[in-house]
């Protein structure tokens, strides 16, 4: 393949055997697309804001005389950009303005005559906007809205699996779930009666619902039952025969016709008997009269002469009834066909327990159940039932629900509305009865065809609709009050409920989460997370095992590996690499189409519903060069996800890639196929906790997923258009765009500003470093600057470390690690953490708080780092307890002694009126102040420091914009110069004249003169734009800040803390192999090899076999090989060998193995080969894709090429004695991560501090500056030792003996080291508790 200039800098050798058919899709699509549909720059009324407005408007007054109509909406421009919102702590949002039309009808004239129309734009609150990276900035912090996996609307048939009733009888039920509205359930009880529930309330016989729909008993019976006809002829009873219905029954009498006995009495009727009856064309047989007794009449039989109902429908026929019927002149009787096998009499039985008899009584019964205690009226009962299922305002199945409903009932797809029809309800009951009769299957609720994804856009739309409905009620009330003269749409609408609903969703919904910003991977994973929790979802406590388990339909849609450990396991999932959602919200995954055993290039996305009907081959099936399957039988997933062997011609589809199954995080684990699933889960989760190191180091052994993740995460800067790098410094990159990519008439310059040392949500450091040089060509979509944890555009979460697997004096017992001092010296795992500390000056009842350097009772030394405004200098080194911002708070007047009054009068001392409430550095923290920001309320005078900061910001803004203008002007004048030279002006003349005068030249060629004039206009436009931008920037910087009520000033101080690795820090590999550092060992004591090269970390070999994560061993071997090749290249460069030799050696390395990647170095120039070699000196980066990785033979070949033993084991020597260890040791390079569980954040010690109010015992936990709990078991230990005095001390003066501990302090100050323990407070608490029980207990102190 052809590589671009940037790609040639470092090429990762891939061992993947299968070529990539489909590139990894953009990883944040699920977030961006969903919100784009909500915002809808291009209106389509089916979804988003437009749909919400259309569903609520027009709002008509109760008397119909006025209506408020919706015309259109538009979103304005946000006031501040994303970065400014983060600094100021505001929400990044755009104002929503809606054009509404108020129409008044003339009530006297004919209907529909318009009297008056008023149209107006109405402000409806702010809508938060999504940033380019799929996040929201809410109150200055970046948040992510996690997608939710919820039960799809539609109808579900289920059973209790025999768990409800003691007999173990399986009870079936059906549930109609709408998108919004009341749930309707049907269920069988143990007696086989069918019941209905509305909104999970008290159950009613299901036939009440049918009666409420307007059906009579007769209609209900004819809907659910087949009929059997009996004829009365000459006192004989003839039955119409349908032979098929007899199958499986025992004949109650001889079945005979035309003198031939077909089945004798007592014999079972088989299929053979039925065939004979059909062959002979028997349609009627004589039956004994008793046979009809007990059968159920299918309709009402009325005596026509008297009008009396002889036999009502659903009545069992007795001999007397039969006599009455024949007396009334009936020759034919219709009864219901039922049997015990597969035609149960359920509806007939249910009608018998149904207390209602017509529509009204049924509606009243439903009304009583829904609104107990209210007196029902006919209108109220009708309105309630209609509104529940048949009103589009209150009930909506949605397009998804209707599609699922129709599929379930085998109706035509795409037909039907969002409300239920009579046929829908009867259809559900019919199918439920069919299932009870043994025909049909219940649904699998965990099937991904029955669960759908609700993403940001949809949830935001629902919240917005809720807000709109609240507004609708208020508007309708206002319209119905009358007196609408001179009223405008603006007066009617109060936008508060809308913005409140939206704000609540983005600010405090369970699915609106604080973004995990540890590193680029954790950001991407958080945005691709799918949660089953949240509003309308499951709860941790009630979710069973089945919901959490991996389901066959997860294949290629949800990752089976990446899920949290703990109570949320299986409820929070991650999207697989290639998965996406379809229009209905179901997850789908791509497949290659197979036609007649040949795999085509066509790619189709299938959802779980569709996939069940096809046979699908795995991605690693063997194909020949014509893309035909080479095996006679291929392992495939057949129907229902069961795997089996199939012939090539029976296969419909083939997987797209071996990493299709797993998520982004799991796809980063090399040799995942050799790890146990539990450890892989830990590996995937721990990569998200890796802290970005000071210098990112790409993994030597990767999987090829590193680049797409780094690109899509948005932490790096990516070229918008191709071109040549014109300027580079630490804070900006300027690219001169290629001619063919510029828009005619623009300067063709792209300017990229870099983010420098800012704080992430997890207090890690975000910093961008350019990775291109001056004059380099860049293509569109290539990386220009690396962000945190990226190295030349590849994700780099940790460091490549030389490890040895061997025990070392017990320092690697129980997963601990022994680390060499060299790792600390080289700052391999040094990280920068940035903390934000803020100080708020409020207006209190006693007066305003003041930020000042004049603090009472504080010595000079404590104020040495503050300026005259009382704010710390940038660059100051501070430690725990230092003052960062001096602040004083007024305190209440105290009664003064006469002496104090005198002193006050003489010296005018006012200092005692205020108390010190300064912002101090928290205990245990130390660092450097890297930035200070001061926010002042509008109308409050700015202090000196605020004005200095403002001035600096203005200077920077002006410098930035001036530079930008210069760059753009330079580009423009280059084009002017070329144009003038082409037009016949000599270069010498041009050089004499000032640049600005060039634009005044006149050319003979008219076309060229036009171009020149165009460029002159552009130049003028650039100048105006510069002035405009500068003015906007100036206003933003100068204006006061919008602070919370009662806040006058906020000072934010940013501290940077540099943390080196130390004992107690947690580290991990990518295979779930985690541990804590036990000791930092001097380099000279570490084991070393024959070349004198020491290892950097010693790991315990016993941690591997029982955990079954062998991937780490293979990674270690492959890492050694990669480093070995790097060492060889390094040696060749040092020996200054010819480029030809280098090229040959590197080519050999890239050609090794059976991978599908081909790198042809003969197309590289010598300079490019040298630059590639320079980047490979530290090791050849390798990629071993998931489930398609390097084979053992390839690893051995690579080790050989690097001049290393193929066993991967090396003889080591003890650094302390110089003795050889008795057997070779596995040594190699493993990619190690430093996790965000640092000992500095956990270390904590207390001498004195705060106490609990009731028990008077010290508080617990680091955040409260609490003590260590000395619990029950610890007390036992001291009792066992007989350490009585220690125990007494622990339980009294060190805990809750208030007087004792005060005395103890006094004694220590006085220098008498005694303790006088008293009564612990907890005894008094016990006393009070016993008294609360009504027992008077007193302590007698004698």
UniProtKB/Swiss-Prot annotation:
The keyword Nucleotidyltransferase applies. The keyword Endoplasmic reticulum does not apply. Its EC number is 2.7.7.6. One of its GO terms (cellular component) is DNA-directed RNA polymerase complex. InterPro entries: DNA-dir_RNA_pol_bsu_ext_1_sf, DNA-dir_RNA_pol_bsu_external_1, DNA-dir_RNA_pol_su2, DNA-dir_RNAP_su2_dom, DNA-dir_RNAP_su2_hyb_sf, RNA_pol_bsu_bac, RNA_pol_bsu_CS, RNA_pol_bsu_protrusion. It catalyses: RNA(n) + a ribonucleoside 5'-triphosphate = RNA(n+1) + diphosphate. The RNAP catalytic core consists of 2 alpha, 1 beta, 1 beta' and 1 omega subunit. When a sigma factor is associated with the core the holoenzyme is formed, which can initiate transcription. DNA-dependent RNA polymerase catalyzes the transcription of DNA into RNA using the four ribonucleoside triphosphates as substrates. PANTHER family: DNA-DIRECTED RNA POLYMERASE I SUBUNIT 2 (PTHR20856). This is DNA-directed RNA polymerase subunit beta. It comes from Actinobacillus pleuropneumoniae serotype 5b (strain L20).
């Amino acid at each position: 393949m052809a590589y671009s200039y940037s790609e040639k800098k470092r090429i990762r050798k891939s061992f993947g055997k299968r070529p990539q058919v489909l590139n990894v899709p953009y990883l944040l699509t699920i977030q961006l697309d969903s919100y784009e549909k909500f915002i809808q720059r291009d209106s389509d009324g089916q979804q988003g804001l437009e749909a919400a407005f259309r569903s609520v408007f027009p709002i008509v007054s109760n008397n119909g005389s006025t209506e408020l109509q919706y015309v259109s909406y538009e979103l304005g421009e946000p006031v501040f950009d994303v970065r400014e919102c983060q600094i100021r702590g505001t929400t990044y949002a755009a104002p929503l303005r809606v054009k509404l039309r108020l129409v008044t009808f003339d009530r006297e004239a004919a209907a529909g005559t318009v009297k008056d129309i008023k149209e107006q734009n109405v402000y409806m609150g702010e809508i938060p906007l999504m940033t380019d990276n799929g996040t929201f900035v809410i109150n200055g912090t970046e948040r992510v809205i996690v997608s939710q996996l919820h039960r799809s609307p539609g109808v579900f048939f289920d059973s209790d699996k025999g768990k409800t009733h003691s007999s173990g009888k399986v009870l079936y039920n059906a549930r109609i779930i709408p998108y919004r509205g009341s749930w309707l359930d049907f269920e069988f009880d143990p007696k086989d009666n069918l019941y209905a529930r509305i909104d999970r309330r008290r159950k009613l016989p299901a036939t009440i619902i049918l009666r409420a729909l307007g059906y009579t008993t007769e209609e209900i019976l004819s809907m659910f039952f087949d009929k059997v006809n009996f004829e009365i002829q000459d006192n004989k009873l003839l039955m119409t025969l349908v032979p098929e219905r007899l199958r499986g029954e025992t004949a109650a009498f001889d079945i005979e016709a035309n003198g031939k006995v077909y089945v004798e009495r007592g014999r079972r009727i088989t299929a053979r008997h039925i065939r004979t009856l059909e062959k002979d064309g028997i349609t009627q047989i004589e039956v004994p009269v008793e046979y009809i007794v007990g059968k159920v009449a299918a309709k009402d039989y009325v005596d026509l002469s008297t009008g009396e109902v002889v036999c009502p429908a659903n009545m069992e026929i007795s001999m007397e009834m039969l006599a009455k019927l024949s007396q009334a002149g009936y020759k034919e009787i219709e009864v219901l066909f039922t049997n015990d096998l597969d035609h149960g009499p359920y509806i007939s039985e249910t009608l018998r327990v149904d207390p209602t008899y017509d529509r009204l009584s049924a509606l009243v019964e439903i009304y009583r159940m829904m609104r107990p205690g209210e007196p029902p009226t006919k209108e109220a009962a009708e309105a309630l039932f209609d509104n529940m299922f048949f009103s589009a305002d209150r009930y909506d199945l949605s397009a998804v629900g209707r599609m699922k409903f129709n599929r379930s009932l085998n109706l035509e797809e795409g037909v039907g509305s969002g409300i239920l029809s009579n046929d829908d309800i009867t259809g559900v009951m019919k199918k439920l009865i069919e299932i009870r009769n043994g025909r049909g299957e219940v649904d699998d609720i965990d099937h991904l065809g029955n669960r759908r994804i609700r993403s940001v856009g949809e949830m935001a739309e629902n919240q917005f609709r809720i807000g709109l409905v609240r507004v609708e009620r208020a508007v309708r009330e206002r319209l119905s009050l009358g007196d609408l003269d001179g009223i405008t749409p603006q007066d009617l609408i109060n936008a508060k409920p809308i913005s409140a609903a939206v704000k609540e969703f983005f600010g405090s919904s369970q699915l609106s989460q604080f973004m995990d910003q540890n590193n680029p991977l954790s950001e991407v994973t958080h945005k691709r997370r799918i949660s089953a929790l949240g509003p309308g979802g499951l709860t941790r406590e009630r979710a069973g095992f089945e919901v959490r388990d991996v389901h066959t339909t997860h294949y290629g849609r949800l990752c089976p590996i990446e899920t949290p450990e703990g109570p949320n396991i299986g409820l929070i999932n991650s999207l697989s690499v290639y998965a996406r959602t379809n229009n209905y919200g179901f997850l789908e995954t791509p497949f290659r189409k197979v036609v007649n055993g040949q795999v085509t290039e066509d790619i189709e996305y299938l959802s779980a519903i569709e996939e069940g009907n096809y046979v699908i081959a795995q991605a690693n099936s063997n194909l020949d060069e014509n893309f035909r399957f080479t095996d006679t039988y291929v392992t495939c997933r057949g129907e229902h996800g069961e795997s089996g062997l199939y012939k090539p011609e029976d296969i419909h589809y083939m997987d797209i890639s071996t990493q299709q199954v797993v998520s982004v995080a799991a796809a980063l684990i090399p040799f995942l196929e050799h790890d146990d699933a539990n450890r892989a889960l830990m590996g995937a989760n721990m990569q998200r906790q890796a802290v970005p190191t000071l210098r990112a180091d790409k993994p030597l052994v990767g999987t090829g997923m590193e680049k797409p993740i780094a690109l899509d995460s948005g932490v790096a800067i990516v070229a918008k258009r191709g071109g040549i790098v014109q300027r580079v410094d630490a804070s900006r990159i300027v690219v001169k765009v290629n001619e063919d990519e510029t828009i005619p008439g623009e300067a063709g310059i792209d300017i990229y500003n870099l983010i420098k040392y800012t704080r992430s949500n997890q207090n890690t450091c975000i910093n961008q470093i350019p990775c291109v040089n001056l004059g380099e060509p860049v293509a569109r979509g290539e990386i220009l600057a690396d962000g945190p944890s990226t190295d030349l555009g590849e994700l780099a979460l940790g460091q490549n470390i030389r490890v040895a697997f061997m025990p070392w004096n017990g320092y690697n017992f129980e997963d601990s690690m022994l680390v060499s001092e060299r790792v600390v010296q080289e700052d391999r795992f040094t990280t920068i953490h940035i903390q934000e500390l803020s100080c708020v000056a409020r207006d209190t009842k006693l007066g305003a708080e003041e930020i000042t350097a004049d603090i009472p009772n504080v010595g000079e030394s404590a104020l040495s780092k503050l300026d005259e405004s009382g704010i710390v200098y940038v660059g100051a080194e501070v430690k725990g307890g230092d003052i960062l911002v001096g602040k004083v708070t007024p305190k209440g007047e105290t009664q003064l002694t006469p002496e104090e009054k005198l002193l006050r009068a003489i010296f005018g001392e006012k200092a005692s009126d205020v108390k010190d409430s300064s912002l101090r550095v928290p205990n245990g923290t130390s660092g450097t102040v890297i930035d200070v920001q001061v926010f002042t309320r509008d109308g409050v005078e700015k202090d000196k420091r605020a004005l200095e900061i403002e001035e600096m910001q203005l200077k920077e803004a002006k410098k930035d914009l001036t530079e930008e203008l210069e760059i753009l002007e330079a580009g423009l004048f280059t084009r002017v110069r070329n144009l003038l030279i082409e037009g016949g002006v000599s270069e010498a003349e041009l050089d004499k004249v000032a640049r600005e005068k060039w634009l005044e030249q006149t050319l003979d060629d008219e076309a060229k003169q036009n171009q020149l004039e165009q460029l002159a206009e552009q130049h003028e436009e650039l100048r105006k734009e510069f002035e405009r931008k500068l003015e906007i920037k100036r206003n933003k910087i100068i204006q006061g800040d919008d602070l919370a009520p009662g806040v006058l000033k906020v000072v934010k101080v940013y501290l940077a803390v540099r943390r080196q690795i130390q004992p107690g820090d947690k580290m991990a590999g990518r295979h779930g192999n985690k541990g804590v550092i036990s000791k930092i060992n001097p380099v000279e004591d570490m084991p070393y090899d024959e070349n004198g090269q020491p290892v950097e970390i010693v790991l315990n070999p016993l941690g591997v076999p029982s955990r079954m994560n062998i991937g780490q061993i293979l990674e270690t071997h492959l890492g050694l090989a990669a480093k070995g090749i790097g060492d060889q290249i390094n040696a060749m460069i040092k020996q200054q060998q010819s480029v030809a030799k280098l090229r040959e050696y590197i080519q050999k390395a890239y050609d090794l193995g059976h991978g599908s990647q081909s790198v042809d170095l003969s197309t590289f120039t010598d300079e490019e080969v040298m630059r590639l070699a320079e980047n490979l000196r530290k090791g050849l980066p390798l990629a071993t894709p998931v489930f398609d990785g390097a084979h053992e033979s390839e690893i051995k070949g690579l080790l050989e090429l690097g001049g290393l033993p193929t066993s991967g084991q090396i003889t080591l020597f003890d650094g302390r004695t110089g003795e050889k260890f008795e057997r070779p040791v596995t040594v190699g390079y493993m990619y190690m991560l430093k996790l965000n569980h640092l000992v500095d954040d956990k270390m904590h010690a207390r001498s004195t501090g705060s106490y609990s109010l009731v028990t008077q015992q010290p508080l617990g936990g680091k955040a409260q500056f609490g003590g260590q709990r000395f619990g029950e078991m610890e007390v036992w230990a001291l009792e066992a030792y007989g350490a009585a005095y220690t125990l007494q001390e622990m339980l009294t003066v060190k805990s809750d003996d208030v007087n004792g501990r005060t005395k103890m302090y006094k004694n220590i100050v006085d220098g008498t080291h005694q303790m006088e323990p008293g009564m612990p407070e907890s005894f008094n608490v016990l006393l009070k508790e016993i008294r609360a029980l009504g027992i008077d207990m007193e302590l007698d102190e004698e």
